Each structure stands twice: as structure tokens, then as C-alpha cells.
């Protein structure tokens, strides 16, 4: 299962976005009446309304950033820089999805990585070996589907170590980001800043080439500690009403999918010990 864990290390693999245009046909009824009160004529005019929609490399829709959202991003970037004492080298890259789109991206990017990592028959042999050792009784396809479903619901936002893009799900047709979305953006902006200050892409590539990820959990916990701390600072500025409002805006991120116990992912280290360590350092 090392290859699957490696996928979790990088968070998500390389992605890009492309723009396409979709044309919607709109029917407009127009009525014209002649000078005579006894006769009238009705005509139908067909107009083509073009709507530009952006997609990522998996064909998943990307939501547009409104001018108001751009202002919010600018303010959040300034906040992150102030709290960390560091400055962004360049404007951070980000993709905004609907919640379903974000989950579809997580699944699609994992499957894309899966197809690249496993040679024909390799996955089946690995699962058969697990069956023989009594680790699980799932078929290769069943275990693969379980992992895909876990990927779909396992995160509220993400930052990619390789392409340096942060990805956050938001509600469609919003003018501004709500409080919950802003809080997630703050957390991921810290990771984006970390990626600009430290060459995390090279760090990951070196680990993968040497097949040695022993240092990853400790470093990841420190990275999460800093992101959690800055996020907590931002939320501390909210009054009780806003806190309640933010809580109500939180999507249902409950993940009912559980991976087999031998898929050890030290979330307690990342989000518990790391946070306590960060507070002690601070």
C-alpha cells in the first residue's frame, strides 16, 4: 500500500486548467401589432448566448472568481503574511470548485495517479497477498472503489505540493466567500506560502526517488501546525454571532468511509501533536 500512501503525501498530483466555451440557445418571444386592431403577428427570435466556463484537466468545472472574491483573497493573503512574518513570492494559484466538483476532482486525480503507478496486474497481486494474510477479504475492485470514495470525502480543501495550486470548494453563484470558505482558504494559503518559501516539490521528489518517507510525518505535522495556528488567529477575530454563522455554513464533510487499519495515516500526529507543538513554540 506504499504507493497509495505516497499519493496521500503529495496530497494531489499535477493538474492544470483549460478554458472552453459552451453555447446556450435562448428563445425570445417578440410580438408586434399592426395599425389595425384586428390583426397581429408574432415572431420568434433565436439568439446565441455564449457563456465561458473553465475546466480543469479532468473536465471538471472551475467556478469563476468575482471581483469581490479577489478582494477577499487579497485581504486573506495580507493577513497570512502579517501573522507568519513572511511574504508571498508570487500570487498564489488556486482553483475553486463546487463541493461535488471538488470531490470529483479528488477521485479523478487519485485514479489518474493509480493508473500511472500500477503496472498491469500489480494491484490485483497486492490485494490477493493481503487476502492471503487475512488483512481484508475485499476484491481488488472493491478495495479500489473504497479508496476512491475515501478520497472523495476526506478533505475540506487542499494544497498540492507539486503544482502549488490550492483547491477549495465553495457555493455556486456567490458574490463573496462565506466565513467557512474564508477560514479554509486561510489554512491553504499558509501551505501555499510554505511551498513558495521552501521547495516542497523538490523535497517530495527527492523522497519519492529514494523511496524514503521517514521524515514526512514530522515535517507535515509542523506544516499543519502553522496552518492551523494562523487559521485559529483568523477565526479569533470573529464575534460570537459570526462564529455561529460560520459553523452553520460548514458543509457536511462527514466521511463515513473507513479504510482498513493497515492503511495507517497519522492524522492524530498531523492535526493534534503538530498543533500542540506549534502552540508551545509560539
Where are these regions (language model features)?
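Catalytic glutamate of the conserved HExxH
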Residues: 184, 188-196
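Extracellular mucin-like PTS domains
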Residues: 23-47
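Bacterial signal peptide processing site
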Residues: 18-20
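Short pre-active-site segment immediately N-terminal to the catalytic Zn-binding motif
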Residues: 153, 166-186, 218
Amino acid at each position: 500500500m506504499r504507493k497509495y500512501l505516497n499519493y496521500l503525501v503529495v496530497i494531489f498530483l499535477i493538474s492544470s486548467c483549460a478554458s472552453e466555451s459552451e453555447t446556450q440557445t435562448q428563445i425570445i418571444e417578440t410580438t408586434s401589432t399592426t395599425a389595425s386592431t384586428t390583426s397581429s403577428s408574432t415572431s420568434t427570435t433565436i439568439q446565441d448566448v455564449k457563456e465561458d466556463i473553465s475546466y480543469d484537466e479532468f473536465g471538471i468545472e472551475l467556478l469563476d472568481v468575482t471581483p469581490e472574491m479577489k478582494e477577499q483573497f487579497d485581504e486573506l493573503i495580507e493577513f497570512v503574511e502579517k501573522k507568519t512574518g513572511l511574504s508571498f513570492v508570487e500570487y498564489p494559484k488556486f482553483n475553486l470548485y463546487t463541493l461535488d466538483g471538488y470531490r470529483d476532482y479528488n477521485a479523478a486525480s487519485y485514479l489518474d495517479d493509480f493508473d500511472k503507478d500500477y503496472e498491469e496486474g500489480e494491484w490485483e497481486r497486492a490485494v490477493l497477498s493481503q487476502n492471503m494474510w487475512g488483512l481484508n477479504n475485499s476484491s481488488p475492485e472493491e478495495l479500489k472503489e473504497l479508496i476512491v470514495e475515501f478520497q472523495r470525502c476526506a478533505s475540506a480543501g487542499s494544497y498540492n505540493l507539486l503544482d502549488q495550486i490550492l483547491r477549495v470548494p465553495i457555493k455556486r453563484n456567490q458574490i463573496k466567500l462565506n466565513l467557512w470558505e474564508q477560514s479554509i482558504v486561510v489554512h491553504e494559503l499558509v501551505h501555499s506560502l510554505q511551498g513558495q518559501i521552501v521547495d516542497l516539490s523538490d523535497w517530495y521528489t527527492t523522497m519519492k526517488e529514494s523511496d524514503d518517507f521517514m521524515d514526512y510525518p514530522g515535517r507535515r505535522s509542523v506544516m499543519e501546525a502553522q496552518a492551523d495556528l494562523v487559521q485559529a488567529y483568523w477565526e479569533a477575530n470573529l464575534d460570537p454571532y459570526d462564529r455561529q454563522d460560520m459553523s452553520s455554513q460548514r458543509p457536511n464533510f462527514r466521511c463515513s468511509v473507513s479504510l482498513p487499519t493497515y492503511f495507517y495515516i497519522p492524522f492524530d500526529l498531523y492535526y493534534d501533536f503538530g498543533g500542540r507543538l506549534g502552540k508551545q513554540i509560539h
